[in-house]
Amino acid sequence: MGYIAVVDYDMGNLHSVCKGLEKVGGNPLVTDQAHVIDGATAIVLPGVGSFDPAVQHLRARGLEEVLKTAIAKGIPFLGICLGSQLLFDSSEEGQETGLGIIPGQVKHFRSEPGLTIPHMGWNGLQFNQPDLCLWQDLPPEPQVYFVHSYYMAPLDPQVIAASTTHGSQTIAAAIAKDNVMAVQFHPEKSSTLGLKILANFVKKVALSDI
């Protein structure tokens, strides 16, 4: 049986992500080793914290190239929260360049009267890619859990898989292109609907591993 590499770079709540994957039948393996990531049937890049230290930690472990190579080979990939932002070229939060998998930038919410930043709590999703495997069997506008001050702003709006609105600002809540999927929210903290999203990812992994 293959395994899902959950990348450890000192920036993620790995326990809750692994617990969620295990609950839905996945076989997660926490690792910071390039050869382990290279042998995985899928990769999950979680993350909580700031952009620059995250990129620095990935590069210090020599993980940038193995992640890019795995993605180029078509390995199913799921980024979560900060892990989703690292796929982009850069962030307004820092000076480091990102992985550059998805062209675009990570931006900070604009201040507006009555708007709480960070965006923290439950919010509904609007599906831009309703047929994406992650959304299979979900209700319309499912409520998921967010904690973030920055958001993904891809150059190509076609890669936006779901959107959400905070104040007057509608932003990308998820992106998907080929084998790469990434969510700004925390599926592992989003109750039964979040577990369903993880289950859909695990199902895709199983199908791709046949």
Swiss-Prot record:
In which broad location class does this protein mainly occur, judging by the first location in its UniProt entry? cytoplasm
| Functional pathway | Amino-acid biosynthesis; L-histidine biosynthesis; L-histidine from 5-phospho-alpha-D-ribose 1-diphosphate: step 5/9
Question: Can you tell me which residues form the catalytic site?
Answer: 81 (nucleophile), 186, 188
Keyword Lyase on entry: yes
Q: Where in the cell is it found?
A: Cytoplasm
- Which residues does the UniProt record annotate as the domain Glutamine amidotransferase type-1? 3-210
Entries under InterPro entries matching the protein:
Class_I_gatase-like (IPR029062), GATASE (IPR017926), Imidazole-glycPsynth_HisH (IPR010139)
PROSITE patterns on file: GATASE_TYPE_1
GO terms for CC?
cytoplasm
Q: What is its EC number?
A: 4.3.2.10, 3.5.1.2
Q: Does the keyword Lyase apply?
A: yes
Question: Care to name a GO molecular-function term for this sequence?
Answer: lyase activity
Q: Which reaction does it catalyse?
A: 5-[(5-phospho-1-deoxy-D-ribulos-1-ylimino)methylamino]-1-(5-phospho-beta-D-ribosyl)imidazole-4-carboxamide + L-glutamine = D-erythro-1-(imidazol-4-yl)glycerol 3-phosphate + 5-amino-1-(5-phospho-beta-D-ribosyl)imidazole-4-carboxamide + L-glutamate + H(+); L-glutamine + H2O = L-glutamate + NH4(+)
Keywords for this entry?
A: Amino-acid biosynthesis, Cytoplasm, Glutamine amidotransferase, Histidine biosynthesis, Hydrolase, Lyase
Query: What is an annotated GO biological process for this record, any one?
Result: L-histidine biosynthetic process
The record, for Gene3D superfamilies, names: 3.40.50.880
The job of this chain, per UniProt, is described as: IGPS catalyzes the conversion of PRFAR and glutamine to IGP, AICAR and glutamate. The HisH subunit catalyzes the hydrolysis of glutamine to glutamate and ammonia as part of the synthesis of IGP and AICAR. The resulting ammonia molecule is channeled to the active site of HisF.
List the NCBIfam families. IMP_synth_hisH
Assembly and binders = Heterodimer of HisH and HisF.
Q: What is this protein called?
A: Imidazole glycerol phosphate synthase subunit HisH
State the species of origin.
Synechocystis sp. (strain ATCC 27184 / PCC 6803 / Kazusa)
What's the encoding gene here? hisH
